[in-house]
Amino acid sequence: MLDITYVRQNLAEIESMLQNRQLASEKPRLRQLLEYDKNRRELVQRSDEMKAQRNKVSKEIADIKRTGQGSGEELIRQMKEVSDEITMMDATLSKLASDIEEILLSLPNRLHESVPTGKCAEDNVICKAPVPYLHLLDFPIKNHLELGRSLGILDFERGAKISGAGFPVYIGKGARLERALINFMLDYHTDHHGFTEVFPPFFVNQESLRGTGQWPKFADQVYHIEEDNLYAIPTAEVPVTNLHRNEMIDAERLPVSYVAYSACFRREAGSYGKDTRGFLRVHQFNKVEMVKFTRPEESYQELEKILMSAEAILQALMIPYRVLLLCSGDISANATKCYDIEVWSPAEEKYLEASSCSNFEDYQARRMNIRFKADSRSKPEFVHTLNGSGLATSRLMVSLLEHYQNRDGSITIPEALRPYTGFTSIDQLTS
């Protein structure tokens, strides 16, 4: 959430940000916000004056009663009128505060100066050229669906029977491979990159979703359990970032770095017409997430570290990938700067998003009231929060299966995963 003072003092920047994000339609709400803010500040001043007058009259009434000079009835009548007006003002102020917060919660974050201006995904900038790991595929290539079926390791049909479309079932060595990927990534981030592992709840309350920015803007994308008023998490970012909600973090601990595995649940409302085959778009998937809390002056340096940590996984697995810097029209509403890592699918002949690494500056921390003090004499400041997928297994599995397939239809397990799988290949089923 943006600071209302910052919005008021940097109106031209905020309007430009909305324009660059292709959200010019939000400008009337911005003007409404400033009108609410102006009315609130004027009313606060008037309310303070009235309260000062009430205190003055109360003292005069007390003096009259103490000295016995008159009944003070007129002053009592005046004080009642003032008190009634203050009560009405307080109610109006409460409504204005609610209206201001509602608009602030819906406004997107500011953009970092390095974010390229663009309208859509086609305008994203390739900031790291494709990193090729040559796997000789000089035979007809099968896609991950064909491989999963022929090897007996993936079953989307039974998943649909159990839960509906978008809920895959991993079987046998497929289940072992999925678990191996998760454990490998967790170990890599904790052992090589200094992250502390967290195993968070998979269901959160509305306040947690609001803290990270998924609520109310993306309310239609989350699964809701009405009886308990809990929500299935769309990403481990939500519970892990909320670990420090309403807390003051010791400055000496910063940056705080967490990594967490979770299942992720997304309704994917509005995905009609998009490619939903296999793992390309699912309602439930597994992901390892990195989350950082940093000092403001260190957050962009830490963003680069998160990106390198995610890249290191693909380098260890020898999966071809590229890195994009998202443009202003494609970046998420909460982020000031975001990199996407895309893995290559030989069968689809295109890149698939497998990770997003984002800096939110104080946008989430302000919502969640997460602060630190640089030293004992300093005023509390909001931390900066960052996160990055490290990685999502679904699209990673697509690229892995397709790249490591062999002419006979078997899959060779990448060397980095073999200590976790306990096997070196997945062979064709025999009838």
From Swiss-Prot:
One biological process GO term for this chain? seryl-tRNA aminoacylation
- Domain of life (superkingdom): Bacteria
**Record's catalysed reaction(s):** tRNA(Ser) + L-serine + ATP = L-seryl-tRNA(Ser) + AMP + diphosphate + H(+); tRNA(Sec) + L-serine + ATP = L-seryl-tRNA(Sec) + AMP + diphosphate + H(+)
Enzyme class, top EC level, equals ligase
Which locations, inside or outside the cell, does it occupy?
Cytoplasm
Which pathway or pathways does this protein act in? Aminoacyl-tRNA biosynthesis; selenocysteinyl-tRNA(Sec) biosynthesis; L-seryl-tRNA(Sec) from L-serine and tRNA(Sec): step 1/1
- Which SUPFAM superfamilies does this entry report, sorted A to Z? Class II aaRS and biotin synthetases, tRNA-binding arm
Instruction: Please state the Enzyme Commission number of this protein.
Output: 6.1.1.11
For whether the record's keyword set contains Secreted, the answer is: no
Similarity comment text for this entry: Belongs to the class-II aminoacyl-tRNA synthetase family. Type-1 seryl-tRNA synthetase subfamily.
Domain characteristics, as noted in the entry: Consists of two distinct domains, a catalytic core and a N-terminal extension that is involved in tRNA binding.
Instruction: Read off the HAMAP family from this record.
Output: Ser_tRNA_synth_type1
The protein's assembly and partners? Homodimer. The tRNA molecule binds across the dimer.
Summarizing the function annotation, the protein's role is:
Catalyzes the attachment of serine to tRNA(Ser). Is also able to aminoacylate tRNA(Sec) with serine, to form the misacylated tRNA L-seryl-tRNA(Sec), which will be further converted into selenocysteinyl-tRNA(Sec).
Protein name, entry field: Serine--tRNA ligase
Instruction: Look up and give the organism this protein is from.
Output: Chlorobium phaeobacteroides (strain DSM 266 / SMG 266 / 2430)
Q: Which gene encodes it?
A: serS
